[in-house]
Amino acid sequence: MTPTGWDQTEEPALDSPTLGVLAIVIAVLVACVLLAGCGAGDGHALGDEPITPAAIAAIAQEHVDLEPRRIAASTVLAPELGDRSTAAWLEYGDVSLTVVVAPSSNSPLVCADPTFFDECVTDSVDGHEVTIAWQQLEPEEDPGVVYVIDRRKGEDALVKVSGPSITDGPRDLALGVPLADLAALVVDPRLSLTTSLPVVEQGADVDIEQGGPHETPAPR
């Protein structure tokens, strides 16, 4: 006996073409999630092109609202971060930046040993979760140094800030480049060991010295 009010009408089965369309839609949505958004088309998506010092410099110039006096490839941090690290050095008058991406390591420069720096803290800067490390001024010896670091799966991206006298925590100092801009730079997904072809091509337009600057090994 059929219970009162029970609607025995069966739901129509989905035909094969409909199932095919649904499968395509699901596949596209999954691809969009993996690529961090559809319709990017602006060269920001990660790729498999090895990043170059010139490409790193091009990315840095998008975040730093200053005109560099000099740009050079840099290997000054390679002894600490490894031969697979890639870096660019940009000089802006009283401040210079060394921007590096390297395979993950236990280097003290990425705060693997937090006692290496005077301070090594994880902080949110303008919505970007980064690690900030610094060594303070030693009068008549060393002006100090600041590092802003993004530790990711498989790699570390960081920027070393040289030039200003570090007399306090970086949040309380004028570094020459806003801390928020430095944080946005190191978390930029294009700043990776491998990046997209458009980013590499963008770097081809950068006037960069290949010999490297005369830097002193850091941080001391």
Question: What name fits each language-model region?
Answer:
Residues 28-31, 97-115, 178, 204, ...:
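Secretory-pathway extracellular proteins and peptide precursors enriched for disulfide-bonded cysteines
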Residues 47-70, 179-192:
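Short, non-transmembrane alpha-helical segments in secretory-pathway proteins
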Residues 9-28:
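N-terminal export and membrane-targeting signals
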Residues 70-144:
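Short, solvent-exposed recognition patches
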Residues 39-41:
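Bacterial signal peptide processing site
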Residues 35-37:
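C-terminal motif of bacterial Sec signal peptides marking the signal peptidase cleavage site
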Residues 141-144, 151-220:
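Extracellularly exposed regions in secreted/surface proteins, prominently low-complexity, repeat-rich
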Residues 2-8:
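Short, charged N-terminal extramembrane segments
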